[in-house]
Amino acid sequence: NNFFLIFVFMKIIFLDIDGVLNVYCEGRDQFGCTFHSNFVDNLRNIIEQTGAKIVISSSWRSDGLKTMQEMWKFRNYPGEVIDITPFSWELMDLGLFEYYDQIDRGHEIELWLKIHPEVSNYVIIDDDNDMLDNQRANFVRTANNNHHGDHVDVLGYGLTKICSEKVIEILKN
C-alpha cells in the first residue's frame, strides 16, 4: 500500500508559536499577529532541508486545526500543518491524569506520538521547558540567552539560525 509507505518515515515538528515564531507583533491580519519574518525564514529552511511536517503544539491550536491550516496557507508560511496536539482536557477524559496541573505539554506530545506510530523522527520547538525526560534529545528550547549570532535575537529567544541548525541536526539523525 503506497499510502502507508509515504507516512512510515514521516518527520514531525511539534511547533509552539509564541516565543518561537511570534516574539512581538510584526503586523496583524484576520488571524491576529503575524510572525517574525526572520523566524519564518528559519522555519522554511528547516522544512526545505528535512521535509518535516508540522503539528501545532501551541496554545494557538485552540482555534482548531482548520483555522491553523487556513492561516498557514493565507500567510504563505512554509511547510504543511497536518495536525494539532491533544488538549489537557482530552488527556483527563481518557483517564490518564487526575488533575490538570499534572499535565505538561510533553504529555500532550507523548499522546500524539502514541497515536501516530508512523513517525520516524520528531523535534519539539518551544520556549517553555515542560517536556518529558525522554523527549529532551528531541527538544530545542528557543528561550535561551546563549544565542548571539542573530541580530534579531535582542530578546534572547525565538527560532534563531542557531536553533534552526539544532532542529535540522535532530531531524536528520
Where are these regions (language model features)?
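Short, Lys/Arg-enriched N-terminal segments with co-localized hydrophobic residues
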Residues: 1-9
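Catalytic phosphate/metal-binding cores of nucleic-acid and nucleotide-processing enzymes, i.e., regions
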Residues: 10-173
